[in-house]
């Protein structure tokens, strides 16, 4: 591995490249860059071989693979080209002939008398070695070339003895003579850029040999900044540590990426670190421990000149926000420097940083709190209780549950912050998908401690308890009674002497109301709360709580989408979206809005918009483990499945399963199995569909209603697709249950899935449900119900067009198949051909039709189709005969059959039907 390509400067004085080592991972070290750089190597070869070129200079930032591209370009020439690989000495070194030392050692004594003699001697030696072949020299680190070596190389180029491939970060780093050759066009420049996120994904998949989730690729891309060489080092280290594992057929991380430098990465970092001034090293040490610091605080510790120089060199990054937060330019650098630092050194640096006293807590941002807490834990020191609570709360806000547990774990029952700390611990456990542990954390708070809480603290504690109980089968039904008792307690507080603050009591009451709305939404029982929820979401009077109104509105829009009011739900969603900017400070409100909006859009048939909405959720998910990437992958896959595009759903679904199988996630795994079974069924892979269906059946457990209802639907649809005779009845029963609870949207979707082979009664029920709903999906359901009941091909073709408008491929195929059968039965040739053409256009995206036409054979034979296509394009009968190799009379006979079968009378009508 070229250390120069990764360093802040040139750290090796090696005169020839070392042997390539085998990486810890499945691909050789330089192979990683090669996977991304083959096209660049070809560009270098092309430029090098141009008639007017003396050579090529490869430029780019450290770590982009300049040396690798040069070596790959050389290796492509084969034995007919003589190649030499040279490397200049480090910067600041004036070693004469540094890169040519090995060649210099071979010269006879008579050729060492003067620079001119050396120049001629080296030129003759290289010509002799080339033995008449063309010669190409690869010069690594050309920016540090000494003057005498420059003269020799220029002579080799000018005399056409050799051509040159040189590497440098910038053309301005080159010796002046080489820079002049570039400006005159005699040396070409090939500029390398860092890998994009998509290229990182492609390299990982090629190198590791299996699926890699987009979330993992994104995480690694951000970590290494698109450097293929660093990417290999990080991946190899994570595989060696057992953190990056192959789960099923997908590579996934078991935990966050922590770099301890056990591979070549530490050598790279130590070499870079050793080159810095003592003051710059201390800045690196401080930022390694602190992770991030405001520029104002860093400037109180170090001179502005040092900070400015480090920013200019890219060693630190200062963001452009109001606080100007400073971080290291490369995150991996901080991880490794921190790892080798002693505890005493960490403590010494922590005491130097101002702004961490307890009375300054209110002045710290969320990021400051987390950074200070992490630094303290790195020092094996205890956080003060107030700091621990604040840091735990901040970690929960940023979805970093493991760190929240670490912070809250330092509190003891004797601390005044104990009850609130257990509240944060419970929230963290829920984020990890561990409701039993979350409930246990709250149970550890004594009744006396609960009673000592003020009104708002008490309400928040009860709300947290209700959130946990909803997940536990034996306690979920007790939530309404818990809330009733809590309201009685608040009423008692209002009668105390002195009474509690009325404003605080009002806020506590709203907290319990919101908790109740969330509970009913969790269990899918919308009717009992709709009136109160609507009032809470729409009441806008002086003195009302706008945040409570906004949170209630977010729950309401999902409730509306479930109960048949899809258009109202989407209207409310747009209104809320326009208000969110004012409330960006409210914890996790954007994520809550985005995920409930996803459900609104998905149930409205707008699956593309649902996927787009996830970008907001995943982009803001926080700093924690994978930032919810498994949930995002699952939701994307589910949207594709609902759209009937199983072939597109499999990659994100399998990536989600790989992540969910290695960690608990509130029963999302069961939903992932069910959706994957449905996706495989849609692609016609009945074996895999059955396997994942069995896994879904065995992965039982509590789940949010939106998840459990979707899971059951996917399982029943997969079963129906596989020919399970009982699947239809299960879907009908599910639809009836939803209907009785007022969930008309879900009822309509279930009955629609059941009526692929429905009865008149089923279609009447579907039509009734469509009348209770809003939006294009409801209208399409109504059209399908009427067309299926009347066996009307024209109506079914209309339904197919409606499905095409929503891009619901499987539904469109279903409508087209039925339209084909109805048209054939009624002798409507044109309609039958229109339906058949539609089915053919869907053959790739829907390989396994939800319903097969009774007449499976094509309307035209293969020869008839070939002739009809040529005729429709204006080819004469004579030319068709020559093209196909038959007589003109036979062509005329085939065309007669085509016109008869398709019901057309002119050639111009053929193209639209074939």
Language-model features, listed with the residues they occupy:
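C-terminal non-catalytic interaction modules
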Residues: 1-29, 34, 55, 347, ...
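Conserved phosphate-binding/catalytic loops and adjacent sensor/switch elements of nucleotide-binding enzymes
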Residues: 20-21, 29, 33, 59, ...
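N-terminal pre-P-loop "Q-motif" helix
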Residues: 30-46
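Alpha-helical sensor/transducer elements of the RecA-like P-loop NTPase core
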Residues: 68, 121, 148, 152-216, ...
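Alpha-solenoid helical repeat architecture
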Residues: 95, 281, 321-325, 329, ...
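Internal alpha-solenoid helical repeat scaffolds
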Residues: 75-79, 157, 176, 181-183, ...
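Extended alpha-helical scaffolding segments used for macromolecular assembly and cargo binding
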Residues: 55, 72, 305, 344-432, ...
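Short secondary-structure boundary elements
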Residues: 62, 203, 207, 211, ...
């Amino acid at each position: 591995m070229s250390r120069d390509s990764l360093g802040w400067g040139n750290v090796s004085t090696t005169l020839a490249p070392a042997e390539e080592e085998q990486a810890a991972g499945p691909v050789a070290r330089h192979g990683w860059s090669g996977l991304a750089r083959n096209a660049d190597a070809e560009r270098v070869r092309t430029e090098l071989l141009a008639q007017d070129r003396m050579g090529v200079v490869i430029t780019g930032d450290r770590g982009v693979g300049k040396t690798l591209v040069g070596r790959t370009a050389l290796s492509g020439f084969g034995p007919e080209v003589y190649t030499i690989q040279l490397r200049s000495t480090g910067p600041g070194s004036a070693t004469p002939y540094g890169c040519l030392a090995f060649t210099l050692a071979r010269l006879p004594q008579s050729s060492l008398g003067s620079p001119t003699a050396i120049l001629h001697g080296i030129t003759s030696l290289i010509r002799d070695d080339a033995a008449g072949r063309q010669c190409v020299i690869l010069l690594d680190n050309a920016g540090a070339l000494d003057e005498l070596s420059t003269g020799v190389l220029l002579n080799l180029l000018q005399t056409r003895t050799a051509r040159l491939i040189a590497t440098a970060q910038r053309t301005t780093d080159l010796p002046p003579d080489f820079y002049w050759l570039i400006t005159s066009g005699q040396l070409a420049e090939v500029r390398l850029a860092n890998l994009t996120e998509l290229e990182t994904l492609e390299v990982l998949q090629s190198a590791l040999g299996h699926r890699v989730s987009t979330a993992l690729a994104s995480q690694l891309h951000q970590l290494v900044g698109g450097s293929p060489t660093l990417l290999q080092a990080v991946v190899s280290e994570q595989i060696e540590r057992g953190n990056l594992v192959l789960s099923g057929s997908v590579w996934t991380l078991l935990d966050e990426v922590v770099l301890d430098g056990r591979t070549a990465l530490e050598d790279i970092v130590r070499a870079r670190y050793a080159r810095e001034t003592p003051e710059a090293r201390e800045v690196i040490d401080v930022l390694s421990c602190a992770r991030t610091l405001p520029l104002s605080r860093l400037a109180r510790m170090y001179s502005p000149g040092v900070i400015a120089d480090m920013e200019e060199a890219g060693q630190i990054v200062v963001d452009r926000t109001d606080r100007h937060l400073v971080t290291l330019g490369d995150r991996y650098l901080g991880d490794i420097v921190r790892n080798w630092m002693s505890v005493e050194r960490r403590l010494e640096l922590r005491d130097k940083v101002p702004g961490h006293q307890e009375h300054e807590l209110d002045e710290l941002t969320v990021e400051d709190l987390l950074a200070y807490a992490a630094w303290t834990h790195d020092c094996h020191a205890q956080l003060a209780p107030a700091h621990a609570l604040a840091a735990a709360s901040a970690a929960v806000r940023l979805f970093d549950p493991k760190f929240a547990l670490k912070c809250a774990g330092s509190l003891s029952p004797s601390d005044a912050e104990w009850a609130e700390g257990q509240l944060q611990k419970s929230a963290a456990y829920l984020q990890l998908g561990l409701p039993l542990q979350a409930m246990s954390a709250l149970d550890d708070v004594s009744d006396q401690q609960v009673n000592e809480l003020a009104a708002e603290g008490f309400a928040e504690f009860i709300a947290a308890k209700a959130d946990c109980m909803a997940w536990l089968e034996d306690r979920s039904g007790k939530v309404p009674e818990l809330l009733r008792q809590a309201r009685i307690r608040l009423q008692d507080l209002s009668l105390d002497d002195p009474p509690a603050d009325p404003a605080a009591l009002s806020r506590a009451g709203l907290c319990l109301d919101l908790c109740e709305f969330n509970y009913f939404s969790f269990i899918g029982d919308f009717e009992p709360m709709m009136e109160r929820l609507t009032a809470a979401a729409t009441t806008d009077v002086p003195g009302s709580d706008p945040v409570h109104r906004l949170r209630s509105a977010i729950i309401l829009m999902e409730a509306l989408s479930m109960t048949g009011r899809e258009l109202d739900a989407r209207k409310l969603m747009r209104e809320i979206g326009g208000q969110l900017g004012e409330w960006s400070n409210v914890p996790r409100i954007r994520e809550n809005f985005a995920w409930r909006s996803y459900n609104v859009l998905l149930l409205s048939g707008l699956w593309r918009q649902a996927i787009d909405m996830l970008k907001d959720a995943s982009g803001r998910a926080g700093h924690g483990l994978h930032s919810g990437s498994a949930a995002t992958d699952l939701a994307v896959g589910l949207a594709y499945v609902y759209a009937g595009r199983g072939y597109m759903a499999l990659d994100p679904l399998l990536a989600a399963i790989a992540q969910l199988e290695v960690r608990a996630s509130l029963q999302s795994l069961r939903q992932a199995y069910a959706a994957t079974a449905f996706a495989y069924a849609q692609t016609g892979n009945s074996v895999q569909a059955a396997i994942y269906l069995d896994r879904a059946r065995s992965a039982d457990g509590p789940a949010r209603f939106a998840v459990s209802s979707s899971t059951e639907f996917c399982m029943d649809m997969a079963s129906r697709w596989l020919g399970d005779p009982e699947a239809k009845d299960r879907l009908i029963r599910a639809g009836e249950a939803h209907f009785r609870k007022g969930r008309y949207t879900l009822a309509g979707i279930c009955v629609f899935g059941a009526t692929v082979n429905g009865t008149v009664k089923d279609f009447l029920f579907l039509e009734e449900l469509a009348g209770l709903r809003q939006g294009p999906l409801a209208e399409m359901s109504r059209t399908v119900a009427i067309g299926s009941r009347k066996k009307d091909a024209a109506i079914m073709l209309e339904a197919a067009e409606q499905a095409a408008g929503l891009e619901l491929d499987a539904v469109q195929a279903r409508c087209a198949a039925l339209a084909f059968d109805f048209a054939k039965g009624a002798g409507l040739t044109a309609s039958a051909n229109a339906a058949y053409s539609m089915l053919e256009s869907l053959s790739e995206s829907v390989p396994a039709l939800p319903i097969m036409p009774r007449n499976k054979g094509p309307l035209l034979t293969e020869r008839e189709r070939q002739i009809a296509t040529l005729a429709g394009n204006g080819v004469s009968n004579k030319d068709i005969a020559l093209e196909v190799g038959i007589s003109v009379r036979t062509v005329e006979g085939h065309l007669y059959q085509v016109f008869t079968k398709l019901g057309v009378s002119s050639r111009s009508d053929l193209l639209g039907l074939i």
